[in-house]
Amino acid sequence: MFGFVKYLFKLQFLFILAAVLAGLYRTEIKQFANRHAANYVDKADVETVSLQFKAANENTATVLTSAELSKYNGEDGQPIYLALLGSVFDVTRGIKHYGTGCSYNFFVGRDASVAFISGEFEEYDPQTADDVLTLKPNDLLGLANWRDFYEKEYIYKGKLIGRFYDEQGEPTTYYHKYLALLEQAQIAKAEVDELRSKYPGCNIEWSEAKGTRVWCTNTSGDGKERAWTGFPRKLYSRGNKNFNCACVPESELDQIDAEGQAAHGDVMFKTYDNCSSRAKECFYRV
């Protein structure tokens, strides 16, 4: 008799789980199931059938065309949507930022991913507005941070048909190229972060008369005291024209200066222009 009751409970549990996946009564059902499961199911079975929730929209994402997305502009009672890297988010609760006449209204009803980096909100060109493959590695990292922000703060609504997703909502070749470039940028950043832990940053100051001054001390960078002072060098990362100042110990200067990159892939050290290789400080103007 108990076995039959146990079977009925498990059958009931499957219906409950189906309702959960449909997004119905999630909190109430979970509380009920967790409260009563132990009365009918063995401990081992409880562990086996423990509830695992997923957001209802993870596997049922809406696919929108550009024309459909443009209608979600907050006018005539419509919610406010925007797209970033082909993912659509409902930002209605941020109306003070995205409403008509507000600072981020430029992004509403479209995918203007590039503008998140460029800051150019004056003109919208649908041919280039979401062409992120033209961005620099650090910009791709910044864009990924923006996407993380929207996933955390706003409601994901679906996918935009275009560069990143096709009519079935599947990732396009373009999207895979973007992911490959993003991975390269992440690897390059990890390399630089590793080098920064080994080669601390410089002290930096600016004056109108002399421009930017960089120099090393035995506490420059992270502020922790070390046994050596070091000499300032430009530290570049892969595909990036910008650089950071790093302090390099004297014992490694000859190797780094001779090889140009010290066997760290595309991460490179360079001397400052018009500055001696053994100078304690260097000056430059941007």
Curated annotation (Swiss-Prot):
- Tell me which UniProt keywords the record has, alphabetically: Coiled coil, Secreted, Signal
Q: Which SUPFAM superfamilies match?
A: Cytochrome b5-like heme/steroid binding domain (SSF55856)
Residue ranges annotated for the Cytochrome b5 heme-binding domain, each copy included:
61-145
* SMART domains listed in its UniProt record: Cyt-b5
Please indicate if the UniProt record lists Cytoplasm as a keyword. Answer: no
Signal peptide residues on this chain, from the entry's feature table: 1-23
Q: Which residues form a coiled coil?
A: 176-200
* InterPro entries the record matches: Cyt_B5-like_heme/steroid-bd, Cyt_B5-like_heme/steroid_sf, MAPR/NEUFC/NENF-like
Q: Indicate where this protein resides in the cell.
A: Secreted
Major localization listed first in the record, in broad terms: secreted
Give an example GO cellular component term for this record.
membrane
Swiss-Prot/TrEMBL domain comment: The cytochrome b5 heme-binding domain was proven to bind heme, although it lacks the conserved iron-binding His residues at position 98 and 125.
What the protein does?
Heme-binding protein.
What protein family is recorded? Answer: Belongs to the cytochrome b5 family. MAPR subfamily.
PANTHER family reported for this sequence: MEMBRANE-ASSOCIATED PROGESTERONE RECEPTOR COMPONENT-RELATED (PTHR10281), NEUFERRICIN (PTHR10281:SF4)
Q: What is this protein called?
A: Neuferricin homolog
Species this protein is from: Drosophila pseudoobscura pseudoobscura (Fruit fly)
- Mind giving the lineage of the organism this protein is from? Eukaryota, Metazoa, Ecdysozoa, Arthropoda, Hexapoda
